């Protein structure tokens, strides 16, 4: 009797080993068949996703400017499913009188940093109004969008705007790279 139990146990454990070995083997084959994206593919994905996020952020800024004439700095996060969620320290339509824009920017950045650190977002946008100078040297209002992506890609887009007959109209824009503040090395690693 004990021999039968031992033999059954050996056969049973052998079957488990064969099944487990097969599963490990299939898993290894799946891992080998996965394509590792090239650096160029990653760069293209980052640019496509940040372009999409920038368009959504500028659309939201225009809507808020048309409705309220101004806005406090706000943020946007791009989730893995393509959804964009906005971060408001001061909700649209609330008074911006007496606010400290630096504190509001810090609150928005902190919220986005937390989302980035936990891996919830792929990209972030920090959006704020800025009074710059046009190419002719005149004062010009602009919407700045600081874009960042999880691979460390970071650029700011400055888009000038004017009040047109049908509301806010974006005119010219420029862009440049900057040091990331959301997807920092602490988040990327």
Question: What is each stretch, according to the model?
Answer:
Residues 11, 73, 142:
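Broad gene-expression machinery/nucleic-acid interaction feature
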Residues 6-7, 27-29:
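Terminal, compositionally biased segments
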Residues 1-12:
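Bacterial N-terminal signal peptides that target proteins for export
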Residues 29-107:
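N-terminal domain-onset segments
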Residues 96-126:
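A charged amphipathic helix-loop-strand protein-protein interaction module that recurs
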Residues 11, 15, 65, 109-112, ...:
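Generic secondary-structure transition motif, activating predominantly at the C-termini of alpha-helices
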Residues 115-189:
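Low-complexity intrinsically disordered segments
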Residues 16-25:
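C-terminal segment of classical bacterial N-terminal signal peptides
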